Amino acid sequence: MMRFKRTVSRRALSAKIAGAFWAVMFAGMTSYGTGLFDVAAKDNDVVTLRVCNWEEYIDEGDWDDDETIELPEGDIIGVNPMYKDFEQWYYDTYHQKVKVEYSCFGTNEELYNMLSLGNEYDVVCPSEYMIMKLMAEDQLVPFSDTFFDESVDENYYIKGVSPFIRNAFETNEINGETWSKYAAGYMWGVTGIVYNPQEVSKEDASTWNILTDKRYFRRVTIKDNVRDAYFAAVGAIKGDLLTSDDFINDPDYHQNLATEMNDLSPENLEEALDYLQKSRDNVYSFETDSGKADMMSGKVVAGYQWSGDAVYTLDQAEEDDFYLNFAVPKESTNLYFDGWVMLKKGIQDDAKKQQAAEAFINFVSRPDNAVRNMYYIGYTSVISGGDDNTVFDYLDYNYGVDDESEDVDVMEYPLGYFFSGDADDPDYVLITDSEQAERQLGAQYPSDDVMNRSAVMRYFDTEENAAVNRMWIEVRCYNIKNVPAYIWVVVVVAVIAAIAVLIRGKIVERSMKRK
């Protein structure tokens, strides 16, 4: 095994690519599988597949030769954008022309607005709460039975998705229907705190209360969106309950944790408002993307981050010999997913289009392609690989060390929960530097202990969304209720004085005209 052959993700090296459309055509024809996909073999029509994904969220290719990832299963290198490689693979595999129109969005809300304004896509990749919303609104096409057939060689998703992720998708429901019926995972992660260990202790970084900790006045950042901010607030205000032995040892702990972290009662909203207003007065900034740069520049010593962005931040800082850590709050962490779904308005009962859409999802889920995407963007794929060890070998390629290394404090880092579904599986124990438990490895693949205290934040219905947004407006706008009385007196006096000066000026002006 090699020590930290990890390099900075390609995302850190590439220019921002947003809203671009790419397409390549190849000749051919096919039929796929059985059942739903008995497509006419002699149909020469080109299938146009419209895919909309997050910005910088798929391998765009153009790797240098020295970026080649050398694994036991073979070398991996990205030459072309993955969606172009899919077109060629689809033709080679199914002998059918397909043209991919690839475009991007910046936020879930932007995607939803695009759909509401009439933009039509076949496959999109929203986050879990937007998937839930689209399911509730009956906007999605369910996967075919063929998609779940593990005997089909090309069904890389169902054969390779992590047992941990698969369980989450099969046990969470909207209106009595599981996520897995409509969504296939793509990337996943947790939320936590990136911090400078020279300035902040691990203990301080391991609680959501750091956002209001006066010792870090104007030296910590918080996410500038209501969902992430509200989750942190709930974790902080319910901290004593969530970390109590009685709560943790309850047989229904996970269900209770999800209930508490999704508490949208008026009382909880009021407490969250108070906490977030205190946070606003303490943090350096509310941010969406600038927090990474602020951490790397030293403007702040801690920042609320998604684990994928945490890996990017740690990578970039390390390039300058500046070492940061990642901690997951003890109260709870938000388990998030981005996943592929098919839209009714795009697919429109077109069997050939659905065939291509499901094949695209399978293609990006092939273990070597999962590695390409992880390397390029820095986030963690939901793919563990099943019987294919490519993903675990890539993990070892990045973080593995020789267990006899004398210059490294070596530890065993068990990852069976993700790769096989058995937390104690000896086949999936990584030998690594102990520091990595609190650095990139711990962010990319959190420990089983961390995942045990994770919770999925569900989507807000119309009424809940209105209530949460009202609360958020009070957080982000200046709260006049907190203005001291003496300030109001000064304001009133100033207004009266200004009016008096104005009136006096008018009187003088009139008297001058009379003269």
Question: What do the PLM-derived regions correspond to, one by one?
Answer:
Residues M1-A41, C477-K515:
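Gram-positive cell-envelope targeting signals
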Residues F37-K133, E137:
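Early extracytoplasmic/lumenal segment of secretory-pathway proteins
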Residues R50-D66, G74-V79, Y129-N282, F286-M296:
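Extracytoplasmic ligand-binding site segments that recognize negatively charged/polar headgroups
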Residues K84, E109-Y121, A136-E137, I210, ...:
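Short helices/loops that flank or line small-molecule/ion binding pockets
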Residues F105, C125-P126, I222, F286-E287, ...:
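Short beta-strand and adjacent tight-turn residues that come in two discontinuous sequence segments
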Residues D281-D349:
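Extracytoplasmic/periplasmic substrate-binding proteins
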Residues M342-Y445, P484:
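Mature extracytoplasmic/periplasmic domains
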Residues F419-K515:
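Conserved C-terminal helix/tail region of periplasmic/extracytoplasmic solute-binding proteins
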